[in-house]
Amino acid sequence: FMPTIRGSDVGSKKRYAGLSVDAAGNESMIYRGLEMARSDWTPLARQFQEGLLSRVFQGAPYREFIIEYAHSTLAGKKDDLLIYRKRLRHRLDAYVANVPPQVRAARIADEYNDRVGRPRQYQNGGWIQYVMTRNGPEPLESRRSRIDYEHYLAKQIKPIADSILIPLGEDFVTLTSSQQELF
């Protein structure tokens, strides 16, 4: 399976998934360049992609899986999978014009560390874990806002689903729109 490049109808030779069968008949999935293999996607996205591709390759029902996955995400049943883990490659003060979400989360974390009398952790780079909330990115250690589940559906689940569903003649919105309680 070679999903199309987003915004195009052409596949990418560096992004694919396949079902490999060895001489003994043992099956294993192979992922290259997809969200499963990338470190900048959440565990939610990786688990969803693996589950969806596995069902498609096995000829198992996948529509119910997509609907249930979206529903359980919105219901807060997958909160432990919503964590972004990103590396800060520069000092925090080096981010001026373009401030990505992980930098915003790191600044909030260090402000929190200042308030509680702990040393700052992120001024010189490092790894940050954060979630997307209704007030933007917030670090795990000081999250106060409600999780933005719609962000995870729109930015993590939908792109993966559409990259697999569109070649099959379906799409995420159509599949889930019959489930009024989702949106």
Name the predicted role of every residue range.
Residues 1-183:
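DNA-dependent DNA polymerase catalytic subunits
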